[in-house]
UniProtKB/Swiss-Prot annotation:
It comes from the Bacteria. It is found in: Cell inner membrane. This is C4-dicarboxylate TRAP transporter large permease protein DctM. Belongs to the TRAP transporter large permease family. Pfam families: DctM (PF06808). The lineage of its organism: Bacteria, Pseudomonadati, Pseudomonadota, Alphaproteobacteria, Rhodobacterales. Disruption phenotype: Deletion mutant is unable to transport succinate, and does not grow on D-malate, L-malate, succinate or fumarate as the sole carbon source under aerobic conditions in the dark. GO terms for cellular component: membrane; plasma membrane.
Length: 440
């Protein structure tokens, strides 16, 4: 009964057009102060302890790094490098767009930032080359979603924050720890590269089928020049992932390092940003960070309410007693997350749903790391379909296309992503191969 009241109130508030963060906060406070006896000082304490986790500090740093890279000319040089490598294949610039998105995803941690950085440069070039605008928009909208799967990923940090500290037990009754940010980052490498390959194949196949243009093959000298110019940006991938794996720094420290590195190469190496531009980038990053931290704060309260009412535990008991197998549970989770993607953005979905679904998943024997990657892939799909697919709106602003037209344009790649979602869901080895290899 408590669950029905809580979710009914939350949905009712969201249907009024109220921001999700405020809807969460009002739902929690209304329920706590009218239907429970929880002391107000406990609620206040939970607000503060919920956002003092060390991992949360990674979010503003990755946002800052992504903003420096977006405005600092790194994307342009990555596109030139990708074009020099694959521009002569079928769909040349389209393939270069997929690869450039994958490379930029590995330094930004954000899908919208990837779409803006790569799309604003390569989409006009594709139209000038003779590609249909719909083709270019489909490539960049979906490939930009790699920004939250290829590490570093802000959504992975959200999942780790949402599930950290939870006391959950596996099917044998033994306690199971939640996934760390480092484990999730390493787990995202193989799925991220695989999805990039799937999207690249879809792009190549459609370009070959419809006879879209390709560029002349670049010489070795041109490729070397393009690589040398992009090397400073590419080194950030080594700094973040290599530093975490080598144990030089934690994911949060890696985020801070990436922000400093991105500032340095944008201002002093590539010089596409001046010191006068830095306050504007800092303010933009602060605005986005504040918005996410406000959502996190209210989501922490919501998770506290769920735990206080015993909803995740009751859901787990019901599913186990009903004889629900792990693969049936994952079907339900995928449908639930894809449906949630129709009216909520990824950060809110992860912060609300992960604390509820995570204990049930662990109870059914599903690995926390694998479950996290599956949720992230679901969020990728949600960012590319209406009505609130964030990548669609970002791409719409770049291409000046309507959302309906863009929705039709992305379907071939969206179907590829759905097929990949099924693969990731039922082949855990894809997510767990690298963490297991590294002994994590």
């Amino acid at each position: 009964m408590s669950a029905l009241i809580i979710f009914g109130l939350l949905i009712a508030l969201m249907l009024t057009g109220m921001p999700i963060s405020i809807s969460l906060g009002l739902t929690v406070l209304t329920f706590l102060f009218t239907m429970t006896q929880v002391p107000i000082d406990t609620v206040a304490l939970k607000l503060f302890t919920g956002i003092e986790k060390f991992e949360i500090m990674a979010i503003p740093f990755f946002i800052l790094a992504g903003n420096f890279l977006t405005h600092g000319g790194v994307a342009k040089r990555m596109i030139n490098f990708a074009t020099a490598m694959v521009g002569h294949w079928h769909g040349g610039l389209g393939l270069a767009g997929v690869i450039a998105c994958a490379l930029f995803a590995a330094v930004s941690g954000s899908s919208p930032a990837t779409v803006v950085a790569i799309g604003s440069v390569i989409l006009p070039a594709m139209v000038n080359q003779g590609f249909p605008k719909q083709f270019g928009a489909g490539v960049i909208t979906t490939s930009g979603a790699l920004g939250i799967l290829i590490p570093p990923s802000i959504v992975m940090v959200m999942y780790a924050v949402a599930t950290s500290g939870m006391v959950v037990t596996g099917p044998d009754g033994q306690p199971v720890s939640s996934a760390s940010v480092g484990e999730l980052f390493m787990a995202g490498v193989v799925p991220g590269l695989m999805l990039a390959g799937f999207l690249a194949f879809t792009t190549w196949n459609r370009a070959r089928k419809f006879g879209y243009p390709r560029l002349e093959k670049a010489s070795l000298r041109q490729r070397w020049t393009a690589f040398r110019e992009a090397a400073w940006g590419l080194m950030l991938i080594v700094v973040v992932i290599g530093g975490i794996y080598a144990g030089i720094f934690t994911p949060t420290e890696a985020a801070a390092m990436s922000a400093v590195y991105a500032f340095f190469i944008s201002v002093f190496v590539y010089k596409d940003l001046t010191l006068r531009d830095v306050p504007r980038v800092l303010l933009s990053s602060a605005n986005m960070s504040a918005m996410l931290l406000y959502i996190i704060t209210n989501a922490v309260l919501f998770s506290f309410l769920m735990a206080h009412e015993g909803i995740p535990q009751a859901l787990g008991e019901w599913m186990v007693n009903a004889g629900l197998s792990w693969w049936m549970f994952l079907i339900i989770v995928n449908i639930l997350l894809l449906a949630a993607g129709n009216f909520m953005e990824p950060s809110s979905i992860v912060l609300i749903m992960a604390p509820i679904l995570f204990p049930v998943a662990v109870r059914l024997g599903i690995d926390p790391v694998h479950f996290g990657i599956m949720i992230v892939v679901n969020m990728e799909v949600g960012m590319c379909h209406p009505p609130v697919g964030l990548n669609l709106y970002v791409a719409s602003g770049i291409t000046k296309m309507g959302i309906t037209e863009l929705t039709v344009a992305v379907w071939p790649w969206l179907l590829t992503m759905l097929a990949f979602l099924v693969l990731v869901t039922y082949v855990p080895a894809i997510s767990l191969a690298l963490p297991n290899l590294l002994g994590m």
